[in-house]
Amino acid sequence: MPTDRDKGPEDRWRPAKGLILGVDLDGVCADFYGRMREIAAEWFETPVESLTEEVTFDLHEWGILTPAHYESLHRFAVTQRDLFKTAGLIPGARKYLRKLSNEGVRIRIITHRLFMHHLHRAAVEQTIDWLDHNGIPYWDLCFVRDKEQVGADVYVEDGPENVKGLRESGCYTICFANSTNRSIGEPRAESWDEVYQLVKRYAATSGAAARRHPAAIMEGGKDEI
């Protein structure tokens, strides 16, 4: 009967194997604010350098003062500039998601991009195109507002209200740091390398993967792209 001594390092017990990682897109994987800044500069006919990179969630720093104003800009960005397809990749996202996937973590992409009426088809198509183009591995793609409903073991999220809501629901949530969430406490990650370390630490200390997904640990799995 094979023993650990007979196995290669990649086959030995990996505490993260079978763990479900719920990952937000905008501000975590996709550089939503960087791309929106470029589009907003075009919208306002102003140099992009005149729009600060230090923004809060509602973007009022750029002169967007009402929900209707935000909706107009957002609709233009999605329908005329393919916002969700053309946003850049946050450094490290692909590298560390693929690394986690190869270690047996099940990547569950969770986004609330369907919050505006009559943009659902564009949002879904652009999202899938972006994920494929950037080589992001995932098992599931969920468009949902109440993210705790998807049942992940660990969440990576940047929206301050989303982080608060997930934590209040008892979900272990890593806050991906940016200017919109400076008031949010630990656990925080300034980079995807830090996300990776926090996920591994959680898996090693909680045993969540072993408790919730014994079949995955026994049989393994591979994320689809």
Predicted regions, residues:
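Active-site neighborhood of HAD-like aspartate-dependent phosphohydrolases
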Residues: P2-H69
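Metal-dependent phosphoesterase signature
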Residues: V48, D58-K95
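A short, structured active-site edge motif that brings together acidic residues
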Residues: T52-V55, R108-H118, V124-E148
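Substrate-recognition element of Asp-dependent hydrolases with the DxDx(T/V) motif
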Residues: F84-L89, A93-T127
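Anion (oxyanion) recognition and catalysis
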Residues: R98-N102, D132, R167
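A structural signal for isolated positions on well-ordered beta-strands in alpha/beta enzyme cores
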Residues: R106-R108, V154, I174
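Asp-based, Mg2+/Mn2+-dependent phosphohydrolase catalytic module
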Residues: P137, P160-I225
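Conserved Lys-Pro-Asp/Glu-containing loop-to-beta segment of HAD-superfamily phosphomonoesterases
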Residues: L141-R167
